[in-house]
Regions:
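An exposed, glycine/acidic-rich loop-and-rim segment of catalytic or binding clefts
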Residues: 1-230
Length: 230
């Protein structure tokens, strides 16, 4: 539904994906962002697993870009308003190629009844600069992260680690989050080659990406996928 409008008058929309077990993902075309992920608590009521943005103004004012789709290190990219539509049980968000050197981009959001939330990043078109996309999804709570890396299990913040057993274009297990007190576990799968832990204001993200991206050419379809099992 219509959630609000940007300063330029573009419509800001809010979408909700739901699945079995009371799980829910809220999305907005402002920043192609995840505005909240919920799961049923011990009393059956929904509990927020991520930061929740209640208004579009709060989302656009969040310069930590929590939940937003990011493109390389482009400043302000998370403030863009994407074209969006519903395709059966999928939410699709797109940006046309622009005069800023970026290609056509799309993000596909899916949620199945097993609680698998999939985020697929797509792009096509030549770029002069190295190109990469990711969704910066932060989690709130007493989570204990473990990365599956080529160097063994890792829990340190900051740097990118190569994902254990990574193969190009293959989705593989990359990390997990455990909250023993709440009895929750989140598993993260990715097709990206690297992963790192990022913290902000008591929250953390397991950021899937590539620390050594390359430019795209006209013939290449950029396609990377992250899956969160919760």
């Amino acid at each position: 539904y219509l959630w609000g409008a940007s300063a330029e008058g573009e419509g800001i929309l809010l979408y909700t994906l739901r699945c079995a077990g009371g799980r829910e993902v809220r999305l907005s075309n402002a920043g192609a962002a995840v505005t909240g992920i919920f799961a049923a608590g011990a009393d059956g009521r929904p509990e927020a697993l991520t930061p929740v943005f209640e208004t579009p103004e709060a989302l656009l004012a969040d310069y930590a870009d929590r939940g937003k789709t990011l493109c390389a290190n482009r400043y302000g990219f998370g403030q863009r308003i994407w074209q969006s539509r519903v395709e059966t049980d999928r939410i699709v968000m797109e940006l046309p190629a622009g005069d800023d050197g970026l290609p056509v981009m799309a993000v596909l959001f899916d949620l199945d009844d097993d609680g698998q939330f999939a985020v697929t990043h797509l792009a096509r078109g030549a770029t002069a600069a190295p190109f990469t996309m990711t969704t910066q999804l932060f989690w709130q709570g007493d989570w204990r992260p473990t990365l599956r890396t080529q160097e063994g299990p890792a829990t340190d913040d900051g740097r990118f680690y190569p994902v254990e057993g990574w193969r190009q274009n293959i989705l593989g297990e990359a990390a997990r989050l455990d909250d023993p007190a709440a009895g929750r576990t989140i598993e993260i799968l990715t097709s990206q080659p690297e992963i790192r832990i990022v913290r902000h204001d008591g929250q953390l993200a397991l950021l899937c990406g590539d620390s050594r991206p390359t430019p795209l050419d006209d013939e290449t379809l950029y396609c990377q996928k992250d899956v969160y099992r919760f």
